[in-house]
């Protein structure tokens, strides 16, 4: 396929108006593309690489923690239609056997053509602090346990890419030193001070899980893990749904940590893509009203319980309502997460040799069509309207 007259996000992390050529599942150059069946004139639309959500729990009624292949399928299908082509399945603080079951399900799951790819697992919990457990169930919190982590990683087929730890726990630094040899260790669900966080970063931690949330605030005389993250060049995950973070906080984070260290995430739960109502997250009841998901019982009453926003919608919100430049938002949602996973530039850029997964958007970042691994999975009617030639030579 050829897509003409579109603004394409390129290897310089900026937009250029040009034609994009695809063959099978890859992006190719004109010389490699000897013929094609379809040429589309996209008339100044935007071509954005498929996003990469490294931290989501669920969507459209499913949760990865359900350990149910049917739930995995509908989550991945929804994510693909939302312009997200790679995801990491996030777990919760749950009973050990349930966590192991999740690992086995993810290890065995085979992705279909219309589903986002599983790039790994984000193990959020159970190695967290009860004082900052948020929507995690404190009943199943564990001290950092390297043997348990190794067993989970084996069961997952070595798919664990991220693990969250609270640095103030006595055994945390020894755990971080060993775990960081195999995956990225992240800090959150913690009440640690600056010094404890700095020690964790010196031992190998390199990321802040949903920065600013479930951790101490950045105060003048007690700067906490956020300042330590800045001092040790850690990456910072941001949930840009308009609920978790004030828009000024997001803009400040981009400046404080630097664009290359910002990772946009959704942290979405099973209500994402659905409506208001009562749901569950990690076995706890959650009430969703509009853009907010809040715990509705127990000591965590009123605590934010993940988001109900896809990563693409969060990126759009950051651009349209938080004044983050589009090119920077895409870098934070498509490029940086894949660099963290070590799969860039095969994924996350619209350049020769990269995977042909991208979203066609209108002026206001409304999704018009989605191409996943070279196949049209959404927006066929839109593309039919923009089909100008078929069965022609590409000379």
What residues fall within each predicted segment?
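Active-site gating loops and adjacent loop-to-helix segments of metal-dependent hydrolytic enzymes
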Residues: 77-88, 130-157, 199-212, 222-235, ...
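Active-site core of metal-dependent hydrolases
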Residues: 150, 154-276
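His/Asp/Glu-enriched, well-ordered alpha-helical/loop segment
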Residues: 225-238, 254-266, 271-360
């Amino acid at each position: 396929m050829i897509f003409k007259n579109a603004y394409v996000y390129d290897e310089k992390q900026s937009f250029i108006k040009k034609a994009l050529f695809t063959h099978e599942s890859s992006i190719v150059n004109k010389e490699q593309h000897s013929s094609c069946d379809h040429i589309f004139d996209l008339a100044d639309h935007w071509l954005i690489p498929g996003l990469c959500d490294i931290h989501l729990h669920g969507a459209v009624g499913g949760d990865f923690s359900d350990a149910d292949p049917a739930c995995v399928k509908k989550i991945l299908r929804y994510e693909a239609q939302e312009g997200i082509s790679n995801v990491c399945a996030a777990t919760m603080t749950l009973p050990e056997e349930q966590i192991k079951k999740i690992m086995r399900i993810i290890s065995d799951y085979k992705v279909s053509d219309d589903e986002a790819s599983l790039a790994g697992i984000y193990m959020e919990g159970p190695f967290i602090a009860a004082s900052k457990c948020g929507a995690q169930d404190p009943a199943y919190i564990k001290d950092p346990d390297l043997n348990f982590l190794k067993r989970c990683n084996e069961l997952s087929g070595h798919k664990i890419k991220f693990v969250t730890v609270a640095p103030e726990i006595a055994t945390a630094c020894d755990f971080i030193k060993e775990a960081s040899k195999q995956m990225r260790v992240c800090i959150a669900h913690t009440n640690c001070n600056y010094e404890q966080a700095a020690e964790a970063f010196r031992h190998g931690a390199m990321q802040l899980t949903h920065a600013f949330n479930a951790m101490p605030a950045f105060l003048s005389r007690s700067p906490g893990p956020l300042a330590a993250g800045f001092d040790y060049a850690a990456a910072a995950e941001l949930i840009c749904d308009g609920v978790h973070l004030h828009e000024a906080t997001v803009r400040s984070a981009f400046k404080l940590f630097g664009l290359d260290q910002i990772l946009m995430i959704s942290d979405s739960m099973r209500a994402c893509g659905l409506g208001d109502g009562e749901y569950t997250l990690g076995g706890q009841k959650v009430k969703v009203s509009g853009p907010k998901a809040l715990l509705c019982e127990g000591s965590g009453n009123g605590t934010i319980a993940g988001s109900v926003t896809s990563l693409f919608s969060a990126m759009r919100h950051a651009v349209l309502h938080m004044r983050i430049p589009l090119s920077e938002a895409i870098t934070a949602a498509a490029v940086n997460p894949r660099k963290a996973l070590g799969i860039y530039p095969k994924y996350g850029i619209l350049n020769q040799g990269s995977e042909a997964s991208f979203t066609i958007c209108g002026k206001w970042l409304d999704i018009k069509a989605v191409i996943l691994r070279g196949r049209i999975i959404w927006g066929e009617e839109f593309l039919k309207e923009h089909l100008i030639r078929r069965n022609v030579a590409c000379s």
